[in-house]
A protein has these predicted regions:
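N-terminal hydrophobic or amphipathic helices and topogenic motifs
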Residues: 6-7, 11-17, 26-140, 149-158, ...
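Short beta-strand-to-loop elements that line the ligand-binding cleft
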Residues: 10, 120-128, 192, 209-220
């Protein structure tokens, strides 16, 4: 089943795609520290995080002690508080509970970063990837909590090693005549979050599909549920969360995975 497919990335590898932390291109010190912490998180803790937010996980990783250079340690002393911009509607990676506390997979990783480095985080809420990137570019934040790399974003941002792996999927309405493959969407509307790494692929491989970009994945799912789009594309981990929610569970379904590229 789809619910078993959430898998934490091997933090020791520089994998090409996946949800990552992102920093300004001119902030390599912070990036190096984050990568060092991700690489040193023990297997047991990674396993715990994965199982907390999914039905299970298959993780084969090695434990390593955190080793920071003298320069990185000095940088931490000079920057004890970091402004972290988070998408407040990006469950199960980042969302806020009824008490206003940050929750999700990425929230757990931020807590491990805090415990291992002493970093303190000032949270900045956002509702879209574009806004989060803009806050980094304008130096109003230091770190994006969860973002997918793309060629456009990599012009101004540096990405940590990915911490979550997952495929892109096609969401459709629960209907007998719903499309089962993107090829069946020619001339129809496909909703996708603005800035998604899948946008260029879809335009290249399926030029007759009418892409409708939304500010976030929730917006894309809403367009689909309301009948204003015929499909929506997102990563599997987010699709799982959406279709298990009370809002969409009786309306939407995961139809198929899209190509071999990893979303997270």
């Amino acid at each position: 089943g789809y619910l078993n497919n959430i898998r934490m990335a091997n933090f020791g590898k520089q994998e090409a795609h996946g949800f990552s932390f992102a920093v300004h291109a001119e902030n390599p010190q912070l990036l190096a520290i984050i990568n060092a912490v991700l690489q040193a998180i023990p297997t047991s803790e990674r396993d715990s995080i994965a199982k907390r937010w999914s039905a299970g996980s298959d993780i084969l990783l090695t434990d390593q002690k955190l080793q920071l250079t003298h320069h990185e340690e000095q940088w931490l002393k000079q920057h004890p508080v970091l402004r972290v911009v988070v998408n407040e509607a990006f469950a199960p990676l980042t969302f806020f509970d009824s008490d206003g506390n940050l929750r999700g997979i990425t929230a757990d990783l931020l807590e491990l970063l805090r415990l291992r480095t002493g970093m303190r985080f000032e949270l900045v809420r956002s509702r879209s990837d574009g806004d989060m990137v803009e806050q980094i570019n304008q130096h109003r934040a230091d770190l994006i909590a969860a973002l997918l790399p793309s060629p456009q974003r990599e012009k101004t941002l540096q990405f940590s090693r990915p911490y979550l792996e997952n495929s892109f999927v096609l969401l459709t309405r629960k209907s007998p005549d719903s499309p089962t493959h993107p090829a069946q969407l020619r001339g129809k509307y496909l909703a996708i979050a603005q800035g998604s790494p899948m946008t260029d692929y879809l335009r290249r491989e399926f030029p007759d599909i009418r892409l409708t970009e939304t500010s976030d994945t929730f917006g894309a799912a809403t367009l689909l549920a309301e009948g204003r789009a015929d499909g929506a594309v997102t990563s599997l981990v987010i699709a799982n969360y959406l279709i298990s929610s009370r809002i969409f569970e009786h309306q939407l379904q995961i139809t198929t995975t899209l190509n071999t590229r990893q979303a997270a």
